[in-house]
UniProtKB/Swiss-Prot annotation:
Its main location: membrane. Keywords: Copper, Electron transport, Membrane, Metal-binding, Thylakoid, Transport. It comes from Anabaena variabilis. Residues 1-105 form the Plastocyanin-like domain. This is Plastocyanin. The gene is petE. Belongs to the plastocyanin family. It holds the Pfam family Copper-bind. Gene3D superfamilies: Cupredoxins - blue copper proteins. Participates in electron transfer between P700 and the cytochrome b6-f complex in photosystem I.
Length: 105
């Protein structure tokens, strides 16, 4: 299944919309650049069930999306450990642009 997460709210807030999402292993999350770019999506190496820097890196998209309407997607591996994965936008992390994806077991 594919889910969409907007980068920046429709009202221009520095948030992921939705900020929390529950998926299954093998699902895809499309990150759609919406408002107040630039944005990127970085998964926290310490805040994932495997505490794996390699897994976090493989899920992340560090390149900045500059224009509204640009998107990038992440497919969670079929063997992704169940639990909570925290991600953030590097330029706007200090403003609270952080989200969580829960992979159901």
């Amino acid at each position: 299944e594919t889910y969409t997460v907007k980068l920046g709210s429709d009202k221009g807030l520095l948030v992921f919309e939705p900020a929390k999402l529950t998926i299954k292993p093998g699902d895809t999350v499309e990150f759609l650049n919406n408002k107040v770019p630039p944005h990127n999506v970085v998964f926290d190496a310490a805040l994932n069930p495997a505490k794996s820097a390699d897994l976090a890196k493989s899920l992340s998209h560090k390149q900045l999306l500059m224009s509204p309407g640009q998107s990038t997607s992440t497919t969670f591996p079929a063997d992704a450990p169940a639990g909570e994965y925290t991600f953030y936008c590097e330029p706007h992390r200090g403003a609270g642009m952080v989200g969580k994806i829960t992979v159901a077991g």
